[in-house]
């Protein structure tokens, strides 16, 4: 999307805040339904980021697959869970939460210290040169097909297996 700089920056900050608030909602909200809706907010914000980056096909796929299918499946599964049996065993803070917090905080600090030291200039020009060559030869849908069948074949297959397992799990839960 070709927007003026100020509007583009405002939308980036607004969507970034939506991502942060949605992520915090997923982690901190005690009600699993609210957490699932917060996850939907995160997926929508990611989709809007793709629109800002001029990746309209990826944004549409993000909305259809993650918001339209995965998030609905999560909400469907959460609604089958009886909340009363889990709420009495709920402890506010456990040892695993502390270990996870330490690991995530150390990963965040290492990323924050690494990102400013990285030379992004060469990476950007190399990527742009590759994109120019690819854009001249084939269309966007052909590029996506080529990348899915070559560069991203293994992750694509893993995602399809995960979706198959989720679908089988949803059917098993629905039959009970």
From Swiss-Prot:
GO terms for molecular function: NADH dehydrogenase (ubiquinone) activity; quinone binding. InterPro entries: NAD(P)H-Q_Oxidoreduct_6 (IPR050290), NADH_UbQ/plastoQ_OxRdtase_su6 (IPR001457), Nuo/plastoQ_OxRdtase_6_NuoJ (IPR042106). It is a multi-pass membrane protein. One of its GO terms (cellular component) is chloroplast thylakoid membrane. The keyword Plastid applies. NDH is composed of at least 16 different subunits, 5 of which are encoded in the nucleus. NDH shuttles electrons from NAD(P)H:plastoquinone, via FMN and iron-sulfur (Fe-S) centers, to quinones in the photosynthetic chain and possibly in a chloroplast respiratory chain. The immediate electron acceptor for the enzyme in this species is believed to be plastoquinone. Couples the redox reaction to proton translocation, and thus conserves the redox energy in a proton gradient. PANTHER family: NAD(P)H-QUINONE OXIDOREDUCTASE SUBUNIT 6, CHLOROPLASTIC. This is NAD(P)H-quinone oxidoreductase subunit 6, chloroplastic. It comes from Guizotia abyssinica (Niger).
């Amino acid at each position: 999307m070709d927007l003026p700089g100020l509007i583009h920056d405002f939308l980036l900050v607004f969507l970034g805040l939506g991502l942060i608030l949605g992520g915090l909602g997923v982690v901190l909200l005690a009600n699993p339904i609210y957490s699932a809706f917060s996850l939907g907010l995160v997926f929508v914000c990611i989709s809007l980021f793709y629109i800002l980056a001029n990746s309209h096909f990826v944004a549409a796929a993000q909305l259809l697959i993650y918001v339209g299918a995965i998030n609905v499946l999560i909400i469907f599964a959460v609604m089958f869970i009886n909340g009363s049996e889990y709420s009495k065993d709920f402890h506010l803070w456990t040892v695993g939460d502390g270990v996870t917090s330490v690991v995530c905080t150390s990963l965040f600090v290492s990323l924050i210290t690494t990102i400013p030291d990285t030379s992004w200039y060469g990476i950007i020009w190399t990527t742009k040169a590759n994109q120019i060559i690819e854009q001249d030869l084939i269309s966007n849908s052909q590029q996506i097909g080529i990348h899915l069948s070559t560069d991203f074949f293994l992750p694509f297959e893993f995602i399809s297996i995960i979706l198959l397992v989720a679908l089988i799990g949803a059917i098993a839960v629905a039959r009970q």
